[in-house]
Curated annotation (Swiss-Prot):
The lineage of its organism: Eukaryota, Viridiplantae, Streptophyta, Embryophyta, Tracheophyta. Residues 327-378 form the FBD domain. This is FBD-associated F-box protein At3g52670. SUPFAM superfamilies: F-box domain, RNI-like. InterPro entries: F-box-like_dom_sf, F-box_AtFBL13-like, F-box_dom, FBD, FBL13/AtMIF1-like, LRR_dom_sf, LRR_FXL15/At3g58940/PEG3-like. SMART domains: FBD, FBOX. It comes from Arabidopsis thaliana (Mouse-ear cress).
Amino acid sequence: MRNQGFTKEDRMNQLPEDLILRILSFLPTELVIATSVLSKQWRSLWKLVPNLEFDSDDYESEHYTFSEIVCKSFLSLKAPVLKSLHLSFRKSVNPVDIGLWIGIAFARHLRELVLYVAPKQTFTFPSSLCICNTLETLKLILGIHVDIPCPVLLKSLRTLHLDSVSYKDEESIRNLLSSCPILENLVVYEYWYNVVNFDIEVPSLKRLEICDVLHKKEFRRYTINVPCLKYLRIEGLNKDFELCLNAPELVEAYFTKGSLIIADKFLGSLKSAKRLSLDILALKMHTRREEWWNLLTVMLDSSPKLQVLKLIDHTQDVSKDNVVSEKWNEPKYVPECLLSHLETFVWIRYDWEREEEKEVATYILRNARWLKKGTISTNPIESKDLEKLEERRKMLNELDSVVRASNSCNLVFEFE
C-alpha cells in the first residue's frame, strides 16, 4: 500500500519536464507559483514557464502590492523566450510599471501580448511600445488609449485585436496599421472618440471582423482597402455608417445586426464572394456599376430578413448604354425576403428607358407579398420634350398596371 501511495504521489514528478511546463503554461501565474511548494524539483520549475498571466483582482497580499508581485515574477523568470503575457488591471496601476513590464517582456522575445484595462482606468499605449521584432499577436481591450503620432514597426505581428479602445486621432489608427507589414487578422470591436473615418489599408490582411453595435448618433465611415482579404464579418452597422470596401479576393462575407449601404466601390468585392450571409433589415444599393442587378439577386437571396430595399442611381444625366454587358436573369426561386419580409421599396432615378431596370422593378412588385409602399422617382425631363414625356408616361403606366403580390401596396411615382 505504501509503495502504491508513493507511486501516486510521485507520478507528476516522473513526467517529462517539457510536459510539466506545458501543463503549467495553461494556468494563471498565481497558481503556477503556488506549485513551487510541491517538491524540491518544482521549487524552480515554475520559473521556466514561458507564459505569464496577471490579474490585479487575484493578487491581494498584506506584504506585497500587485506591482511588487509582478516585478518579483519577472525578476525570477528564467524562460529564454516569453510566449505570452496577459495583463489585466481592474484597479489603478502605475502606467510606468506597465510600460516597464511590457519592455522587459519584449526583451524576452515576447510572442503574444494581451492587455486589459478596466473601463474606469486609462492606460495610454504609446508608440514606444510598438517596436518589437518578435510580437505576433497583440490584443488591446477596453480602457486603453492608442496614441501613435508616427509609424512604428511590428514586423512579425499577424493578429491584432482592438476591443473598445480609444484613439487620440485617425492618424494613430493609420500609423498603427501601417506598422504591421505582415498583418493577416484584424478584429475591431467598437471604438471611441476623435475618430469619424476608420481607414483600414493593409495589403497583407486576410481576415477582418468589425463589430460596432452601440448605434451612436455620430456618423462614421469605414474605408477598407484590403486586396488579399478572404474573410469579412461585419456586425451592427446602422444607417449612420458608410462602408467603402475594396477586396477583390473576398471569399466569405457576413453582415449581421444592421443595415447596409452598397456603394459602387463595394459592388465588385461582394460579387467575388463565394459565400455571402446578410442578417440585415435594410439595404441601400447603388445602380451605376456594370451588371448591378445580378449582384442584387445575390443580395436578396442572402438577406432573408430584409424589410427595406433602396436602389439609387447617382449618375443622373450620364448614359448607361455602354455600361451594361449582360441581361438580367430572374432568380430560380423567389428570395425569402420578398415572400415574407420586404415592406418598403424605393428606387431613386429609375431609368424607365432600360428594359433591365423595368424587369427588376416588375419582378419585385410581382413577388413582394408584404410590400406596403413602393416609391419610384425618375430624372427630370424638360417640358418642351413632349415626345419623351409621353414615352415615360406610357412606361410608368405599364409598371403601375403590374399585378402586385401585395394587395395593400401603395405605389407612388415621383418626378425630380
